Amino acid sequence: MTRISVPAGQERNDGGISVPAGQERSDRGISVVLAGGGTAGHIEPAMAVADALTALDPDVRITALGTERGLETRLVPQRGYHLELITLVPLPRKLSADLFRLPMRVLRAVRQTRRILDEVSADVVVGFGGYVAVPAYLAARSLRTHRRVPVVVHEANASAGWANKVGARSAQRVLSAVPDPGLPHVEVVGVPVREAITSLDRMALRAEARAHFGFADDARVLLVFGGSQGAQSLNRAVAGAAEKLAEQGISVLHAHGPKNTLDLPAPRPGDPPYVAVPYLERMDLAYAAADLAVCRSGAMTVAEVSAVGLPAVYVPLPIGNGEQRLNALPVVEAGGGILVEDRSLTPEFVAETVPGLLNNADTLAAMTAAAALAGHPDAARRVAEVALEVARRARDLRTRR
Protein backbone atom coordinates (compact mmCIF):
# COMPACT_ATOMS: atom_id res chain seq x y z
CA MET A 1 0.00 0.00 0.00
CA THR A 2 1.55 3.29 -1.12
CA ARG A 3 0.67 6.92 -0.64
CA ILE A 4 1.28 9.36 -3.47
CA SER A 5 3.11 12.58 -2.62
CA VAL A 6 1.37 15.87 -3.20
CA PRO A 7 2.48 18.07 -6.11
CA ALA A 8 3.87 21.54 -5.64
CA GLY A 9 1.29 24.09 -4.54
CA GLN A 10 -0.55 21.61 -2.34
CA GLU A 11 0.01 20.40 1.18
CA ARG A 12 -0.66 17.41 3.41
CA ASN A 13 -2.55 17.75 6.63
CA ASP A 14 -1.91 15.66 9.73
CA GLY A 15 -4.24 12.89 8.55
CA GLY A 16 -2.13 12.11 5.49
CA ILE A 17 -4.80 13.28 3.08
CA SER A 18 -3.63 15.52 0.24
CA VAL A 19 -5.74 18.63 -0.21
CA PRO A 20 -5.39 21.91 -2.09
CA ALA A 21 -3.30 24.42 -0.17
CA GLY A 22 -5.31 26.17 2.52
CA GLN A 23 -8.05 23.53 2.69
CA GLU A 24 -8.14 21.56 5.95
CA ARG A 25 -9.53 18.12 6.55
CA SER A 26 -12.54 17.70 8.82
CA ASP A 27 -12.64 14.33 10.56
CA ARG A 28 -16.37 14.75 10.84
CA GLY A 29 -16.79 14.94 7.08
CA ILE A 30 -18.24 12.13 4.99
CA SER A 31 -15.46 9.83 3.74
CA VAL A 32 -15.81 8.77 0.10
CA VAL A 33 -13.49 6.27 -1.59
CA LEU A 34 -13.41 6.47 -5.39
CA ALA A 35 -12.32 3.33 -7.25
CA GLY A 36 -11.68 3.95 -10.91
CA GLY A 37 -8.08 3.74 -12.09
CA GLY A 38 -6.10 2.53 -15.06
CA THR A 39 -7.32 4.54 -18.04
CA ALA A 40 -8.65 8.07 -18.48
CA GLY A 41 -12.07 6.55 -19.18
CA HIS A 42 -12.22 5.37 -15.57
CA ILE A 43 -10.28 8.20 -13.92
CA GLU A 44 -11.93 11.25 -15.46
CA PRO A 45 -15.47 10.35 -14.33
CA ALA A 46 -14.11 9.70 -10.83
CA MET A 47 -12.39 13.08 -10.75
CA ALA A 48 -15.52 14.83 -12.06
CA VAL A 49 -17.48 13.24 -9.22
CA ALA A 50 -14.77 14.24 -6.73
CA ASP A 51 -15.15 17.86 -7.83
CA ALA A 52 -18.95 17.62 -7.55
CA LEU A 53 -18.71 16.07 -4.08
CA THR A 54 -16.47 18.91 -2.91
CA ALA A 55 -18.88 21.48 -4.33
CA LEU A 56 -21.86 19.86 -2.58
CA ASP A 57 -20.08 19.25 0.73
CA PRO A 58 -16.85 21.18 1.40
CA ASP A 59 -16.14 18.93 4.42
CA VAL A 60 -16.18 15.72 2.39
CA ARG A 61 -13.02 13.58 2.56
CA ILE A 62 -12.03 11.96 -0.72
CA THR A 63 -9.63 9.08 -1.25
CA ALA A 64 -8.92 7.68 -4.71
CA LEU A 65 -7.71 4.12 -5.26
CA GLY A 66 -5.27 3.23 -8.00
CA THR A 67 -2.27 1.18 -9.05
CA GLU A 68 1.27 2.28 -9.82
CA ARG A 69 0.84 1.52 -13.53
CA GLY A 70 -2.28 3.61 -14.07
CA LEU A 71 -2.66 7.18 -15.30
CA GLU A 72 -4.08 8.02 -11.89
CA THR A 73 -0.56 8.38 -10.45
CA ARG A 74 -0.35 11.61 -12.46
CA LEU A 75 -3.96 12.71 -12.89
CA VAL A 76 -5.25 12.35 -9.32
CA PRO A 77 -2.51 14.36 -7.54
CA GLN A 78 -2.76 16.99 -10.29
CA ARG A 79 -6.40 17.48 -9.33
CA GLY A 80 -5.49 17.84 -5.66
CA TYR A 81 -6.90 14.56 -4.35
CA HIS A 82 -5.33 11.89 -2.18
CA LEU A 83 -4.36 8.63 -3.90
CA GLU A 84 -3.72 5.22 -2.35
CA LEU A 85 -2.07 2.52 -4.47
CA ILE A 86 -2.94 -1.16 -4.28
CA THR A 87 -1.71 -4.28 -6.08
CA LEU A 88 -2.61 -4.42 -9.76
CA VAL A 89 -5.06 -7.25 -10.48
CA PRO A 90 -5.47 -7.61 -14.26
CA LEU A 91 -7.67 -10.42 -15.52
CA PRO A 92 -5.57 -12.71 -17.80
CA ARG A 93 -7.26 -13.14 -21.17
CA LYS A 94 -5.67 -16.52 -21.87
CA LEU A 95 -4.32 -19.50 -19.96
CA SER A 96 -0.96 -18.57 -18.45
CA ALA A 97 0.96 -18.49 -15.19
CA ASP A 98 -0.75 -15.17 -14.43
CA LEU A 99 -4.07 -16.99 -14.19
CA PHE A 100 -2.75 -19.20 -11.38
CA ARG A 101 -1.35 -16.17 -9.56
CA LEU A 102 -4.65 -14.33 -9.80
CA PRO A 103 -6.26 -15.54 -6.53
CA MET A 104 -3.28 -14.45 -4.43
CA ARG A 105 -3.12 -11.08 -6.18
CA VAL A 106 -6.82 -10.52 -5.59
CA LEU A 107 -6.47 -11.49 -1.92
CA ARG A 108 -3.51 -9.14 -1.46
CA ALA A 109 -5.32 -6.25 -3.15
CA VAL A 110 -8.48 -6.85 -1.11
CA ARG A 111 -6.50 -6.85 2.15
CA GLN A 112 -4.75 -3.62 1.16
CA THR A 113 -8.05 -2.00 0.24
CA ARG A 114 -9.74 -3.17 3.44
CA ARG A 115 -6.95 -1.52 5.43
CA ILE A 116 -7.43 1.72 3.50
CA LEU A 117 -11.20 1.68 4.07
CA ASP A 118 -10.57 1.30 7.80
CA GLU A 119 -7.89 4.00 7.91
CA VAL A 120 -10.06 6.63 6.21
CA SER A 121 -13.26 5.47 7.99
CA ALA A 122 -14.94 5.09 4.61
CA ASP A 123 -18.66 5.81 4.51
CA VAL A 124 -19.16 4.77 0.87
CA VAL A 125 -17.22 3.29 -2.04
CA VAL A 126 -18.04 4.62 -5.49
CA GLY A 127 -16.70 2.33 -8.22
CA PHE A 128 -16.25 3.18 -11.89
CA GLY A 129 -14.91 -0.14 -13.15
CA GLY A 130 -11.37 -1.06 -14.06
CA TYR A 131 -8.69 -3.03 -12.26
CA VAL A 132 -9.00 -1.29 -8.88
CA ALA A 133 -12.78 -1.55 -8.66
CA VAL A 134 -13.03 -5.30 -7.98
CA PRO A 135 -10.76 -5.25 -4.88
CA ALA A 136 -12.71 -2.23 -3.65
CA TYR A 137 -16.06 -3.96 -4.10
CA LEU A 138 -14.85 -7.15 -2.40
CA ALA A 139 -13.17 -5.28 0.46
CA ALA A 140 -16.26 -3.16 1.13
CA ARG A 141 -18.49 -6.17 1.65
CA SER A 142 -15.90 -8.31 3.46
CA LEU A 143 -15.41 -5.93 6.37
CA ARG A 144 -16.94 -6.83 9.73
CA THR A 145 -20.72 -6.56 9.64
CA HIS A 146 -20.87 -3.34 11.70
CA ARG A 147 -18.29 -1.68 9.44
CA ARG A 148 -19.33 -2.90 6.01
CA VAL A 149 -19.14 -0.05 3.55
CA PRO A 150 -21.98 0.49 1.07
CA VAL A 151 -21.12 0.51 -2.62
CA VAL A 152 -22.36 2.71 -5.46
CA VAL A 153 -21.48 1.50 -8.97
CA HIS A 154 -21.27 3.74 -12.02
CA GLU A 155 -21.07 2.17 -15.48
CA ALA A 156 -20.02 4.57 -18.23
CA ASN A 157 -20.13 2.13 -21.14
CA ALA A 158 -23.16 0.84 -22.96
CA SER A 159 -22.00 -2.71 -22.19
CA ALA A 160 -20.82 -3.28 -18.62
CA GLY A 161 -17.37 -4.67 -17.91
CA TRP A 162 -16.72 -7.62 -15.62
CA ALA A 163 -15.61 -5.44 -12.71
CA ASN A 164 -18.91 -3.60 -12.45
CA LYS A 165 -20.83 -6.83 -12.93
CA VAL A 166 -19.12 -8.03 -9.75
CA GLY A 167 -19.83 -4.78 -7.93
CA ALA A 168 -23.48 -4.54 -8.96
CA ARG A 169 -24.31 -7.79 -7.14
CA SER A 170 -23.99 -6.14 -3.75
CA ALA A 171 -24.26 -2.43 -4.59
CA GLN A 172 -26.74 -0.15 -2.85
CA ARG A 173 -27.24 1.82 -6.07
CA VAL A 174 -26.25 1.14 -9.69
CA LEU A 175 -25.90 4.17 -11.95
CA SER A 176 -25.26 4.10 -15.69
CA ALA A 177 -24.92 6.09 -18.87
CA VAL A 178 -27.61 4.13 -20.73
CA PRO A 179 -30.80 2.25 -19.78
CA ASP A 180 -29.51 -1.29 -20.31
CA PRO A 181 -25.76 -1.79 -19.83
CA GLY A 182 -26.24 -5.39 -18.69
CA LEU A 183 -26.57 -4.56 -14.97
CA PRO A 184 -29.65 -4.90 -12.74
CA HIS A 185 -31.81 -2.04 -11.43
CA VAL A 186 -29.88 0.78 -13.09
CA GLU A 187 -30.59 4.49 -12.74
CA VAL A 188 -29.61 6.44 -15.85
CA VAL A 189 -27.56 9.53 -14.98
CA GLY A 190 -25.13 9.84 -17.89
CA VAL A 191 -21.32 9.96 -17.73
CA PRO A 192 -19.73 12.38 -15.23
CA VAL A 193 -17.80 15.09 -17.06
CA ARG A 194 -15.63 17.81 -15.52
CA GLU A 195 -17.32 21.13 -14.88
CA ALA A 196 -14.93 22.99 -17.20
CA ILE A 197 -16.54 21.09 -20.08
CA THR A 198 -20.19 20.99 -18.97
CA SER A 199 -20.21 24.75 -18.34
CA LEU A 200 -18.55 25.52 -21.68
CA ASP A 201 -20.35 28.10 -23.83
CA ARG A 202 -18.93 27.29 -27.26
CA MET A 203 -20.37 30.36 -28.95
CA ALA A 204 -19.11 32.76 -26.27
CA LEU A 205 -15.61 31.26 -26.44
CA ARG A 206 -15.48 30.81 -30.20
CA ALA A 207 -13.58 33.96 -31.19
CA GLU A 208 -10.90 33.37 -28.53
CA ALA A 209 -10.65 29.68 -29.43
CA ARG A 210 -10.24 30.30 -33.15
CA ALA A 211 -7.65 33.00 -32.57
CA HIS A 212 -5.77 30.59 -30.29
CA PHE A 213 -5.44 28.00 -33.06
CA GLY A 214 -5.01 30.48 -35.93
CA PHE A 215 -8.40 30.12 -37.62
CA ALA A 216 -10.50 32.91 -39.09
CA ASP A 217 -13.60 33.98 -37.18
CA ASP A 218 -15.85 32.76 -40.00
CA ALA A 219 -13.94 29.52 -40.69
CA ARG A 220 -15.62 26.14 -40.95
CA VAL A 221 -13.54 24.00 -38.60
CA LEU A 222 -13.23 20.22 -38.41
CA LEU A 223 -11.81 18.81 -35.16
CA VAL A 224 -10.11 15.39 -35.37
CA PHE A 225 -8.90 13.46 -32.34
CA GLY A 226 -8.54 9.83 -31.36
CA GLY A 227 -7.95 9.93 -27.62
CA SER A 228 -4.72 10.71 -25.80
CA GLN A 229 -2.67 8.47 -28.13
CA GLY A 230 -4.39 9.37 -31.39
CA ALA A 231 -5.89 6.89 -33.85
CA GLN A 232 -4.07 5.68 -36.95
CA SER A 233 -7.15 5.08 -39.08
CA LEU A 234 -8.54 8.54 -38.32
CA ASN A 235 -5.14 10.05 -39.07
CA ARG A 236 -4.84 8.31 -42.44
CA ALA A 237 -8.38 9.06 -43.56
CA VAL A 238 -8.50 12.75 -42.69
CA ALA A 239 -4.91 13.54 -43.72
CA GLY A 240 -5.60 11.72 -46.99
CA ALA A 241 -8.54 14.03 -47.62
CA ALA A 242 -6.61 17.22 -46.77
CA GLU A 243 -6.50 18.61 -50.32
CA LYS A 244 -10.21 17.99 -50.94
CA LEU A 245 -11.13 19.59 -47.61
CA ALA A 246 -8.98 22.62 -48.43
CA GLU A 247 -10.69 22.97 -51.81
CA GLN A 248 -13.99 23.21 -49.93
CA GLY A 249 -12.60 25.92 -47.63
CA ILE A 250 -12.54 23.70 -44.53
CA SER A 251 -10.01 24.32 -41.76
CA VAL A 252 -8.79 21.34 -39.73
CA LEU A 253 -7.58 20.99 -36.14
CA HIS A 254 -6.04 17.52 -35.92
CA ALA A 255 -4.63 15.94 -32.74
CA HIS A 256 -2.74 12.97 -34.17
CA GLY A 257 -1.18 11.53 -31.00
CA PRO A 258 2.34 12.00 -29.60
CA LYS A 259 3.67 8.80 -31.19
CA ASN A 260 2.21 9.45 -34.64
CA THR A 261 2.96 11.71 -37.59
CA LEU A 262 0.77 12.88 -40.45
CA ASP A 263 1.56 12.62 -44.16
CA LEU A 264 0.16 15.96 -45.29
CA PRO A 265 0.50 17.58 -48.72
CA ALA A 266 2.24 20.94 -48.93
CA PRO A 267 -0.34 23.70 -48.50
CA ARG A 268 -1.23 25.73 -51.58
CA PRO A 269 -1.53 29.53 -51.54
CA GLY A 270 -4.87 30.53 -50.05
CA ASP A 271 -5.57 27.15 -48.45
CA PRO A 272 -7.29 27.32 -45.05
CA PRO A 273 -5.11 26.17 -42.13
CA TYR A 274 -4.59 22.49 -41.37
CA VAL A 275 -3.34 22.65 -37.77
CA ALA A 276 -1.72 19.34 -36.74
CA VAL A 277 -0.67 18.86 -33.10
CA PRO A 278 0.42 15.79 -31.12
CA TYR A 279 -1.97 16.50 -28.25
CA LEU A 280 -4.57 19.09 -27.29
CA GLU A 281 -3.90 20.60 -23.88
CA ARG A 282 -7.01 22.81 -24.09
CA MET A 283 -9.92 20.62 -25.15
CA ASP A 284 -12.30 23.39 -24.10
CA LEU A 285 -10.81 25.68 -26.76
CA ALA A 286 -10.76 22.85 -29.29
CA TYR A 287 -14.47 22.15 -28.75
CA ALA A 288 -15.27 25.87 -28.94
CA ALA A 289 -13.31 26.35 -32.17
CA ALA A 290 -14.93 23.40 -33.96
CA ASP A 291 -18.14 23.04 -35.96
CA LEU A 292 -17.85 19.26 -36.36
CA ALA A 293 -15.69 16.47 -34.94
CA VAL A 294 -14.35 13.18 -36.26
CA CYS A 295 -13.52 11.02 -33.25
CA ARG A 296 -13.71 7.64 -31.55
CA SER A 297 -16.73 6.81 -29.41
CA GLY A 298 -15.36 5.88 -26.02
CA ALA A 299 -17.78 6.68 -23.22
CA MET A 300 -15.91 9.81 -22.08
CA THR A 301 -15.51 11.11 -25.63
CA VAL A 302 -19.22 10.74 -26.39
CA ALA A 303 -20.12 12.30 -23.04
CA GLU A 304 -17.89 15.36 -23.53
CA VAL A 305 -18.73 15.92 -27.20
CA SER A 306 -22.48 15.72 -26.58
CA ALA A 307 -22.25 17.78 -23.36
CA VAL A 308 -20.86 20.72 -25.36
CA GLY A 309 -23.34 20.18 -28.21
CA LEU A 310 -20.75 19.39 -30.87
CA PRO A 311 -21.97 17.29 -33.84
CA ALA A 312 -19.66 14.39 -34.60
CA VAL A 313 -18.76 11.61 -36.97
CA TYR A 314 -18.20 8.76 -34.51
CA VAL A 315 -15.79 6.00 -35.53
CA PRO A 316 -15.96 3.13 -33.00
CA LEU A 317 -12.72 1.38 -32.13
CA PRO A 318 -13.03 -2.05 -33.80
CA ILE A 319 -12.17 -4.17 -30.76
CA GLY A 320 -14.00 -5.79 -27.87
CA ASN A 321 -17.70 -6.55 -28.09
CA GLY A 322 -18.74 -3.43 -29.94
CA GLU A 323 -18.96 -1.26 -26.80
CA GLN A 324 -17.90 1.92 -28.58
CA ARG A 325 -20.60 1.55 -31.21
CA LEU A 326 -23.20 1.16 -28.46
CA ASN A 327 -21.83 4.23 -26.67
CA ALA A 328 -22.52 6.43 -29.68
CA LEU A 329 -25.93 5.04 -30.62
CA PRO A 330 -28.08 7.22 -28.30
CA VAL A 331 -26.55 10.44 -29.65
CA VAL A 332 -26.64 9.21 -33.25
CA GLU A 333 -30.26 8.07 -32.96
CA ALA A 334 -31.15 11.47 -31.48
CA GLY A 335 -29.65 13.13 -34.57
CA GLY A 336 -26.52 14.55 -32.95
CA GLY A 337 -24.00 12.61 -35.02
CA ILE A 338 -23.40 9.90 -37.57
CA LEU A 339 -21.74 6.53 -37.14
CA VAL A 340 -19.17 5.02 -39.51
CA GLU A 341 -17.29 1.77 -39.08
CA ASP A 342 -13.52 1.98 -38.88
CA ARG A 343 -13.00 0.05 -42.12
CA SER A 344 -15.35 2.44 -43.95
CA LEU A 345 -13.52 5.58 -42.86
CA THR A 346 -11.54 6.37 -46.00
CA PRO A 347 -10.19 9.62 -47.46
CA GLU A 348 -13.00 9.41 -50.01
CA PHE A 349 -15.62 9.12 -47.26
CA VAL A 350 -14.17 12.11 -45.40
CA ALA A 351 -13.88 14.22 -48.57
CA GLU A 352 -17.52 13.59 -49.45
CA THR A 353 -19.21 13.52 -46.04
CA VAL A 354 -17.50 16.29 -44.06
CA PRO A 355 -18.07 19.12 -46.58
CA GLY A 356 -21.65 17.96 -47.00
CA LEU A 357 -22.22 18.50 -43.29
CA LEU A 358 -20.16 21.65 -42.78
CA ASN A 359 -21.60 23.40 -45.84
CA ASN A 360 -25.22 22.82 -44.80
CA ALA A 361 -26.02 25.32 -42.05
CA ASP A 362 -29.50 23.92 -41.35
CA THR A 363 -28.27 20.34 -40.98
CA LEU A 364 -25.39 21.42 -38.76
CA ALA A 365 -27.68 23.51 -36.53
CA ALA A 366 -30.11 20.61 -36.13
CA MET A 367 -27.28 18.22 -35.25
CA THR A 368 -25.86 20.72 -32.76
CA ALA A 369 -29.20 21.02 -30.96
CA ALA A 370 -29.72 17.25 -30.96
CA ALA A 371 -26.23 16.59 -29.59
CA ALA A 372 -26.77 19.03 -26.72
CA LEU A 373 -30.14 17.48 -25.82
CA ALA A 374 -28.60 13.99 -25.81
CA GLY A 375 -25.93 14.96 -23.28
CA HIS A 376 -26.08 14.72 -19.48
CA PRO A 377 -24.25 17.80 -18.17
CA ASP A 378 -25.45 17.19 -14.60
CA ALA A 379 -24.18 13.58 -14.37
CA ALA A 380 -21.31 14.30 -11.97
CA ARG A 381 -23.60 16.14 -9.56
CA ARG A 382 -26.19 13.37 -9.68
CA VAL A 383 -23.60 10.67 -8.91
CA ALA A 384 -22.23 12.82 -6.07
CA GLU A 385 -25.71 13.30 -4.61
CA VAL A 386 -26.33 9.55 -4.63
CA ALA A 387 -22.96 8.87 -2.99
CA LEU A 388 -23.63 11.37 -0.20
CA GLU A 389 -27.15 10.03 0.34
CA VAL A 390 -25.93 6.44 0.64
CA ALA A 391 -23.02 7.47 2.89
CA ARG A 392 -25.21 9.48 5.27
CA ARG A 393 -27.75 6.69 5.54
CA ALA A 394 -24.99 4.19 6.36
CA ARG A 395 -23.51 6.51 8.96
CA ASP A 396 -26.94 7.01 10.58
CA LEU A 397 -27.49 3.25 10.76
CA ARG A 398 -24.12 2.73 12.45
CA THR A 399 -24.89 5.48 14.96
CA ARG A 400 -28.15 3.78 15.99
CA ARG A 401 -26.47 0.46 16.72
Swiss-Prot record:
Region (Disordered): 1-24
GO molecular function, one term: UDP-N-acetyl-D-glucosamine:N-acetylmuramoyl-L-alanyl-D-glutamyl-meso-2,6-diaminopimelyl-D-alanyl-D-alanine-diphosphoundecaprenol 4-beta-N-acetylglucosaminlytransferase activity
Upper lineage: Bacteria, Bacillati, Actinomycetota, Actinomycetes, Mycobacteriales
Main location: membrane
Gene name linked to the record: murG
Protein name: UDP-N-acetylglucosamine--N-acetylmuramyl-(pentapeptide) pyrophosphoryl-undecaprenol N-acetylglucosamine transferase
Single biological process term from Gene Ontology: carbohydrate metabolic process
Biological function: Cell wall formation. Catalyzes the transfer of a GlcNAc subunit on undecaprenyl-pyrophosphoryl-MurNAc-pentapeptide (lipid intermediate I) to form undecaprenyl-pyrophosphoryl-MurNAc-(pentapeptide)GlcNAc (lipid intermediate II).
Places the protein is found: Cell membrane
EC top class named in words: transferase
Catalysed transformations (reactions): di-trans,octa-cis-undecaprenyl diphospho-N-acetyl-alpha-D-muramoyl-L-alanyl-D-glutamyl-meso-2,6-diaminopimeloyl-D-alanyl-D-alanine + UDP-N-acetyl-alpha-D-glucosamine = di-trans,octa-cis-undecaprenyl diphospho-[N-acetyl-alpha-D-glucosaminyl-(1->4)]-N-acetyl-alpha-D-muramoyl-L-alanyl-D-glutamyl-meso-2,6-diaminopimeloyl-D-alanyl-D-alanine + UDP + H(+)
Residues the entry annotates as binding UDP-N-acetyl-alpha-D-glucosamine: T39, A40, G41, N157, R194, S228, Q324
GO cellular component: plasma membrane
